Amino acid sequence: MLKSSKKEDSSKKNQNNKLIFTVRKLFSPIKNFFRKTKTPDNFFGVIKRLKINSQKMTLDERNILANLLELEDKTIEDIMVPRSDIAAIKLTTNLEELSESIKLEVPHTRTLIYDGTLDNVVGFIHIKDLFKALATKQNGRLKKLIRKHIIAAPSMKLLDLLAKMRRERTHIAIVVDEYGGTDGLVTIEDLIEEIVGRIDDEHDQQLDSDNFKVINNSTIIANARVEVEVLEEIIGEKLHNDYDEFDTIGGLVLTRVSSVPAIGTRIDISENIEIEVTDATPRSLKQVKIRLKNGLNGQ
């Protein structure tokens, strides 16, 4: 599971090279400009002037420019992975258990480590450090492999977070609420995707840009992070009340059950709506299938 075929690696490498070339080409005029001036306030002025003179740019380059302009006002809260979707490992887990857990549950290169509860994240481990430890037959707990993360508030601007990640040389930020509890997670990949667009890997579900797909008049596949209000507009039926404490379809499901449901679990939301879990780990809900017994808008 953790190894890709040579063909997939080659295809992904070609995509990455193309992306790097596009970004370098786009940023070369910005780089040349800042060689002449050190004023930070000029950055978005340069971007806006580039947009005005963008006739010779490709569609990808114009999209990146548009994303950069939007980035000026975006905060961590706009893009963070919510607490309910965070996959993490207990500090007391040994290396062998961690290896199996990552294979089965956490298909990512970095995994959060917590002590006691998710409100006490102590850092993260990189999968290459784990493999090195296993290859050299190192025994013991995870403490020696843990790397430090950044603590950030939901209101922090994305550009400020990007600069902080660069200064502190770390790729993960834990978002904390006003009480110091874990509210969400942001990675360097999340920030890059805000600039260049979504970057799919072999673990991403093939949904559309809104993270849901209408299969037919009675079936919708949706990422668990899709907001309930978005689906309500499509379905034509109210799924939650103003006093409910969830915003996503995953949150809706979790209010109906006592724990994260297993893949294949079906839950009746209303007389017309049934939700089936199609992707989940023991710690988080990933994707669901929504069945409409009366069809979209009762059709």
UniProtKB/Swiss-Prot annotation:
UniProt family annotation: Belongs to the UPF0053 family. Hemolysin C subfamily.
Official protein name in the record: Hemolysin C homolog
Disulfide bonds, paired cysteine numbers: none
Keywords of the record: CBS domain, Repeat
SUPFAM superfamilies (UniProt xref): CBS-domain pair, FAD-binding/transporter-associated domain-like
Entry GO CC: plasma membrane
Pfam families: CBS, CorC_HlyC
Note: Despite the presence of the tlyC gene, the true SFG rickettsiae are non-hemolytic.
GO molecular function: flavin adenine dinucleotide binding
Keyword Zinc-finger: no
Gene expressing this chain: tlyC
Record keyword Repeat present: yes
SMART domains xref list: CorC_HlyC (SM01091)
Domain CBS intervals: 80-142, 145-202
Coiled-coil intervals: none
